[in-house]
A protein has these predicted regions:
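Conserved, mostly hydrophobic/aromatic
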Residues: 51, 89, 168, 173, ...
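Aromatic/acidic polysaccharide-binding cleft in carbohydrate-active enzymes
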Residues: 338, 342-439, 443-446
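N-terminal signal peptide
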Residues: 14-30
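Acidic, Ser/Thr/Pro-rich beta/coil linker or hinge segments at domain junctions
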Residues: 474-530
Length: 899
C-alpha cells in the first residue's frame, strides 16, 4: 500500500522557498551557507541572554519609579523579561560604589527589604542575579566596616535566595580612573589611581582590596563565587602596568585568580567580566550615522580600533576586543561574560532605541556566542536610549513610571532566544556580491537553527534582498519552519517598531508569534529570501521521533526513564553520542532520581528551549510533580509540586509550544483532559485548565504542528478520535471529531518530512493498524486508511505499538503481536509500506518505547518476560536491526500498565 502524503519523505533534505508580499524594488543577490554539522563549536549556556541594571534601581523611588522597580508585583517588567528570553540580570553599575548621577558618595547601600524585592522579582521572572557589592571606599566617604557590611548582605542573600543567585561581584569598573575622581581628590590610592612615581600601582592595589573583600565574604558564605573584575576599558587605555606594553585588567585578573578556590574547593572565579560599548561615546554622531554604524561591517569585521565609519566616534570592533582581552581568558580555562554592553555609551535617540538595534543586538549576541562568550547583559540604565525595557511615557511623569515594555532591541534578543540554544555549528559563507549579510548556525542532533541577518538598508544605498541557500551537510532534514524579525518596511532601519513571528511582544501575556511552515521540494537544500533589514531564523528539524519516556540530551545522548514497583523514578543515559553507542556497555546504568516522590504511572519527558530535559510524574498522593535538568546533561533540580491533587490527574504527556515553552497534559479523575503550561520557556507554571467538552480516554497523544502550536488527539467515550489544537489567541479550538473507524484508546503520533501530522491506532472492528493524516501542515484531514496485515499471517498487533522515523524521514512502526513477538513495517523508498516482518523478542510487553540515536538510528525498548528492560537497535541508519539485548534492572517499567 502506498502511504498517502508520504512521497515527500523519500529524500533526506528539502528545498523551501519563502516569499513575502512586500513591494520589491531591490536587487536580489545569492548567498550560499554550508554548515558542517559533524563537528560542534562552543555550547551556548542557557543563561546567555541577560540585562544589566544599576544598583540604584534596587532602591525605592529612584528614576521616577514610585516604590520599587524590582517588585514581584511589577508584572509588566516580569512578563517582558520572560517573553524576550532573559535568564540573567546583573545588578551593579556605577551606583554600586555610591556614584549616583555623577555625585560621589550619594547612592545608598540597599537594605534587606530592597534585596527581598529584587530576589522575589527575579524568582517570579525566572532569572538569576549577578549581585554586585560595594568595593570603592574612598577617603571622601570611608566606611571602616564596608567589607563586613558586604559579607552581611552576601550572607543574607545566600541564606534566603541562593536558588536565584548567579554569583557575586565586587565593585564596578575599577580600571576607569575618572569615575573614581571627586572634588578635592588629586590622588587617592583607595580608588586605584596610579600613585605618582609608582608606575603600575593601580591594578595591584585593586587586586589586594578585591582579595580582602572576597575573603571577608567567604568567611560568611564559604561557597561564594564571583564574576569580576568588570573591566570598564575596552581599549588599551587602562592596561596594566601601562597602556603601551601592558594587558587588560580582565586578562591580568584572570591570570591571578584562575586557580583560586572558594571555601568549599570550587573555582572562586566562575567568569571573567568585561564591559563593552562598541561605538564608545557618540559625541556628535547623528541618528542616521549611528544607524549606519550599528549595521556596518566594520564593527563585526575590523581588527583595529578606528573612528567612524561615520561620525566622530571611536569604535572597538569585536575581533579586536576578542583577540586582546578575551581570547587570553579562554586560554586560561575561564569563561567570560560581557556583564555590561551596548551599541554606544548612553545611546543615540532614534538609533539605539530603533529597529536597527534589534538587528545589531541579534548579530552581537550570535557573534560573541560563536567566540565562546558565556553571556551578555545589555545595560538598562534608567531611562536612556540604549535601554531594552522602558516605561511609557518616557521620561516618567510625576505620578510614577508605568507601562513597561520592550524597545526593538528586545526583539533581537527574542530572535536569539528562538535560535540560540545548542552548539555553535561551523558555517562557511559564499557571498560573491559581498552583501552586508551575516549568518550563524546553532544546533544539536535534533534541531538546527540558522539565523540570517540582512543588514543592507536604504541610507547606505546597498539595500538588497538576499536569496540564501542553506546546505546543512550531514544533517537529515525532516521539516523546516521560519521565524521572521522585521519592522514591516524592508530597507528602513529607523522605525521605532518591530515584529517577530508576525506578532508584537506584549507586557501582559504570552508572546503569540508562530513559525511559518515552509513548502517542500526535493533537491537537498533550503532556500529562503531574506529582505533588506530583515532577520530570519530557519529551524531545520531532523527526522527523529520519540515515543515514551525517552528524550535526547543536547550532546546527542539518549536518556530513558522508568519506575520500579515502589514508584521510584530511575533513569539511564548513553555515555555519549559517538557511534557505536547503543549496546549495554555504552550506557551508564540505571540510577534512581531521589527526592521522595513516588510515581503512580509513567513519566512524561520533554525538552526545554535551552535543551534541558524536564520530566513530569503523577504521584501516588494524586498530585503532579516535575523535575528538570539545571544545565543540559547536568544535575537535576529536584521535585516540585505542580498541584492537581484534587483532580487526580494521571497518564501524562508533554509537548513544546511555539515559543519553546512546555505544556503538560493529563486525564483527570473526572474524565476531562487537563493542561498546565509554562508562562515562558523554562519559567513558572500556570494553574491546571480543563479542556472540557469531550471525555478523553487514557492513551491520548500530543503533537506539535510545524507552526509550533500543540495539538492533542484522543479517543472519546464514543470510540471516535477527537482533536483539539492551540488557537492563535492562545486558547484552544475546542474538540473536533476525526470521523471514521472507531479506535482503541492507545494512539501513536508522528510528523512527516513536509510537516503533516499522522495519527495511528488499532481499529475496534478488525483490530488492524489504521492511520489518518493532515492534508497540509496544520490543515484538514484525510480519511482513515487501513495499513493492512501483509506478512502477519493472522497475528494481530496489540495497542501500545510505536511509530519511529528513519534518518531519511521514512516512518517505521514496531508493535507486539498477539503471538508475543515484535513486528515492524516501514515505508519503503518508493513510498509504499513494506508489509510486516518479525523482530523476534518473544515475551515483550505490548507498550514499547522508541527514539533515534544521534546518528539517526532507531533504538527500541521494551519490558521482557523476565521483567528486565530489553533493547534492539538499527546497526546503521535505515538499516538492519541488531539482536535483542538485556539491559537488566528487573522490575523496571515504562508505563503504568506494566506494573
Amino acid at each position: 500500500m502506498r502511504m498517502n502524503g508520504m512521497a515527500s519523505v523519500l529524500v533526506c533534505a528539502i528545498c523551501f522557498f519563502w516569499r513575502v508580499a512586500w513591494p520589491q524594488s531591490r536587487p536580489s543577490v545569492p548567498i550560499i551557507l554550508t554548515i558542517q554539522t559533524a563537528s560542534h563549536g562552543y555550547a551556548i549556556p542557557g543563561d546567555f541572554s541577560g540585562l544589566g541594571f544599576e544598583t540604584a534601581s534596587e532602591l525605592p523611588n529612584h528614576y521616577g519609579v514610585l516604590g520599587h522597580f524590582f517588585d514581584p508585583s511589577n508584572t509588566q517588567a516580569i512578563t517582558v523579561l520572560q517573553n524576550i528570553g532573559v535568564k540573567d540580570i546583573r545588578v551593579g553599575g556605577g551606583t554600586v560604589n555610591g556614584n549616583l548621577n555623577g555625585v560621589h558618595c550619594s547612592a545608598s547601600i540597599p537594605t534587606n527589604a530592597d534585596i527581598d524585592n529584587l530576589f522575589q522579582f527575579a524568582h517570579a521572572a525566572g532569572v538569576k542575579v549577578i549581585y554586585s557589592l560595594r568595593l570603592l571606599n574612598s577617603t571622601a566617604c570611608a566606611d571602616p566596616n564596608l567589607a563586613a557590611g558586604d559579607a552581611r548582605a552576601a550572607s543574607y542573600i545566600w541564606r534566603k535566595y541562593r536558588a536565584s543567585l548567579d554569583s557575586f561581584a565586587i565593585g564596578n569598573e575599577p580600571d576607569w580612573h575618572h569615575l573614581h575622581s571627586y572634588p578635592g581628590n588629586i590622588v587617592d590610592p583607595a580608588v586605584y589611581e596610579t600613585i605618582p612615581g609608582i608606575a603600575g600601582s593601580a591594578y595591584p592595589s585593586y587586586l589586594a582590596d578585591w582579595r580582602y573583600f572576597a575573603k571577608t565574604i567567604m568567611r560568611s558564605v564559604a561557597a561564594a563565587t564571583f564574576v569580576d573584575p568588570y573591566t570598564g576599558s575596552y581599549t588599551t587605555l587602562t592596561n596594566t602596568p601601562n597602556p603601551t606594553s601592558g594587558v587588560s585588567w580582565t586578562q591580568q585578573f584572570t591570570e591571578d585568580e584562575k586557580n583560586a578556590k572558594n571555601g568549599v574547593g570550587a573555582p572562586l572565579l566562575v567568569a571573567a567580566a568585561q564591559h563593552h560599548y562598541v561605538g564608545g561615546s557618540p559625541k556628535g554622531t547623528t541618528t542616521q550615522q549611528a544607524i549606519d554604524n550599528m549595521l556596518s561591517r566594520n564593527w563585526v569585521d575590523d581588527t583595529q580600533i578606528s573612528t567612524g565609519p561615520e561620525g566622530p566616534e571611536t569604535y572597538t570592533p569585536y575581533p579586536w576586543l576578542y583577540r586582546h582581552n578575551l581570547e587570553p581568558v579562554l586560554k586560561d580555562g575561564v569563561p567570560y561574560r560581557m556583564t555590561e554592553a551596548n551599541d554606544v555609551l548612553g545611546g543615540v535617540q532614534g538609533a539605539s532605541n530603533a529597529y536597527a538595534a534589534a538587528l545589531w543586538a541579534l548579530d552581537y549576541m550570535h557573534w560573541w556566542a560563536a567566540h565562546g562568550m558565556a553571556g551578555v547583559n545589555f545595560h538598562n540604565n534608567p531611562w536612556i536610549g540604549t535601554d531594552t525595557i522602558v516605561p511609557s511615557p518616557n521620561p516618567c511623569p510625576t505620578t510614577g513610571c508605568g507601562n513597561y515594555h520592550t524597545t526593538p532591541k528586545g526583539y533581537g534578543m527574542k530572535a536569539f532566544d528562538l535560535g540560540g540554544h545548542g552548539y555553535v555549528e561551523p558555517i562557511a559563507i559564499s557571498n560573491p556580491n559581498n552583501v552586508n549579510v551575516t549568518a550563524y548556525a546553532v544546533g544539536d542532533a535534533r534541531d538546527l537553527y540558522v539565523t540570517v541577518i540582512n543588514k543592507t538598508h536604504n541610507s547606505t544605498n546597498d539595500s538588497a534582498d538576499a536569496v540564501v541557500t542553506i546546505r546543512p551537510d550531514g544533517f537529515p532534514a525532516a521539516s523546516v519552519a521560519l521565524m521572521v524579525l522585521t519592522d514591516g518596511d524592508p530597507g528602513n532601519a529607523g522605525l521605532m517598531t518591530a515584529k517577530i513571528g508576525d506578532a508584537s511582544i506584549p507586557n501582559d501575556g504570552r508572546w503569540p508569534g508562530q513559525w511559518i511552515a515552509l513548502d517542500a521540494e526535493k533537491n537537498g537544500q533550503v532556500i529562503v529570501t531574506v529582505p533588506a533589514t530583515t532577520a530570519a531564523v530557519v529551524r531545520i528539524h531532523a527526522a527523529r521521533q520519540d515515543a515514551g519516556p525517552i528524550q535526547m540530551n543536547q550532546n546527542g545522548a539518549l536518556e530513558i526513564f522508568g519506575i520500579d514497583r515502589h514508584g521510584r523514578i530511575w533513569h539511564n543515559w548513553q555515555k555519549g553520542a559517538a557511534v557505536p553507542n547503543s549496546s549495554l556497555v555504552d550506557w551508564n546504568g540505571w540510577t534512581v532520581l531521589g527526592g521522595g516522590v513516588r510515581s503512580s504511572a509513567a513519566a512524561a519527558v520533554a525538552r526545554n528551549l535551552d535543551n534541558t530535559l524536564e520530566m513530569f510524574v503523577p504521584s501516588r498522593t494524586g498530585t503532579v510533580y516535575d523535575n528538570h535538568q539545571i544545565t543540559p546533561e547536568g544535575a537535576w533540580s529536584g521535585w516540585a509540586d505542580m498541584g492537581a491533587s484534587s483532580r487526580g490527574i494521571t497518564n501524562l504527556q508533554a509537548a513544546n509550544n511555539a515559543d519553546g515553552s512546555l505544556s503538560v497534559f493529563g486525564v483527570g479523575a473526572d474524565g476531562d483532559l487537563w493542561c498546565a503550561s509554562q508562562s515562558a520557556p523554562g519559567v513558572g507554571w500556570s494553574d491546571w485548565t480543563g479542556l472540557r467538552g469531550e471525555q478523553i480516554n487514557p492513551g491520548f497523544v500530543v503533537g506539535q504542528n510545524l507552526n509550533g502550536r500543540a495539538e492533542v488527539f484522543g479517543v472519546g467515550r464514543d470510540g471516535d478520535v477527537w482533536n483539539n489544537w492551540q488557537a492563535s489567541s492562545g486558547g484552544w479550538s475546542g474538540w473536533n471529531r476525526l470521523p471514521g473507524e472507531a479506535m482503541n484508546p492507545q494512539l501513536a503520533i508522528a510528523r512527516n518530512l513536509t510537516g503533516e501530522i499522522f495519527i495511528f491506532g488499532i481499529g475496534i472492528t478488525n483490530e488492524d493498524v489504521w492511520y489518518a493524516s493532515q492534508k497540509t501542515p496544520g490543515g484538514a484531514w484525510n480519511r482513515w486508511r487501513d495499513l493492512g496485515t501483509d506478512g502477519l499471517n493472522g497475528v494481530k498487533i496489540q495497542p501500545g505499538f510505536v511509530v519511529g522515523q528513519n534518518a531519511d524521514g521514512r516512518f517505521e512502526i514496531a508493535g507486539v503481536g498477539s503471538d508475543g513477538k515484535v513486528w515492524h513495517t516501514w515505508v519503503t523508498k518508493s513510498g509504499d509500506w513494506s508489509g510486516w516482518d518479525s523482530l523476534g523478542g518473544v515475551g515483550i510487553h505490548p507498550q514499547l518505547t522508541i527514539d533515534n540515536t544521534a546518528d539517526g538510528r532507531m533504538q527500541l525498548f521494551g519490558i521482557g518476560r523476565n521483567k528486565d528492560v530489553w533493547s534492539i537497535w538499527q546497526t546503521n541508519p535505515g538499516g538492519i536491526w541488531s539482536v535483542w539485548s538485556d539491559f537488566g534492572e528487573r522490575g523496571m517499567k515504562f508505563y503504568s500498565s506494566q506494573l
